[in-house]
């Protein structure tokens, strides 16, 4: 029978503002110990598929240093430290990154971004219906974001063709397909 590993010891290997790594000592089965199991520690993430009354998708384009490219994706962001409501985080991120807001939210659920080497980092997916532009963008210090509006059918085709490469963006579009096309 599969059993959870036993945590013996935990310490910070790296504890910086934007990146934290924990070094765990774990017993994976009786007598078998791993001394250096590293976990990247992240806050949960919210991803927002915002749909306008005209059935358009609100996308953002920004440089992603990890990929080394300018990426087109759905609005998203980390939950702030101490923030415990993913819906409130989703509303905040949508407004900050795009200036759009919505009063109609549907939760698609949460998914693990990396269940092997990351702790926390659950990805919460939301559908924001009838999204409207109500404010200016409010960027974080490290953001420069362009907002793009695409018909849902075009965004879905972009996901299928690989033009949209973020797995969370593709997943959200695929989950929304049946809801929005019926």
What are these regions (language model features)?
Residues 1-11:
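A short, amphipathic edge element
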Residues 2, 70, 124, 141-182:
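Nudix hydrolase/Nudix homology domain
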Residues 11-47, 52-53:
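Acidic, metal-coordinating catalytic segment for phosphate/diphosphate chemistry
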Residues 21-23, 49, 125-127, 147-149:
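Conserved hydrophobic/aromatic beta-strand scaffold that supports enzyme active sites
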Residues 29-31, 52-54, 63, 83, ...:
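Short loop segments at secondary-structure junctions
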Residues 43, 51-54, 64, 73, ...:
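Active-site segment of metal-dependent pyrophosphate-handling enzymes
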């Amino acid at each position: 029978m599969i059993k959870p590993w036993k945590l013996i010891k935990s310490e910070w290997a790296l504890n910086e503002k934007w990146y934290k790594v924990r070094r765990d000592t774990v017993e994976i089965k009786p007598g078998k110990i791993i001394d250096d199991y590293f976990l990247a520690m992240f806050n949960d993430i919210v991803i927002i598929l915002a749909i306008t009354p005209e059935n358009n998708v609100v996308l953002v384009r920004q440089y992603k240093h990890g990929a080394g490219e300018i990426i087109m994706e759905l609005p998203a962001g980390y939950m702030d430290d101490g923030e415990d409501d993913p819906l409130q985080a989703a509303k905040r991120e949508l407004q900050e990154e795009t200036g759009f807001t919505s009063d109609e939210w549907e939760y698609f659920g949460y998914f693990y971004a990396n269940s092997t080497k990351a702790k926390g980092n659950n990805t919460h997916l939301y559908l924001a219906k009838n999204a409207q532009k109500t404010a200016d963008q409010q960027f974080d210090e490290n953001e420069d974001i362009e907002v793009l509006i695409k018909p849902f059918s075009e965004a879905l085709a972009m996901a299928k063709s690989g033009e949209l490469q973020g797995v969370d963006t593709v997943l959200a579009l695929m989950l929304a397909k049946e809801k929005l096309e019926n």
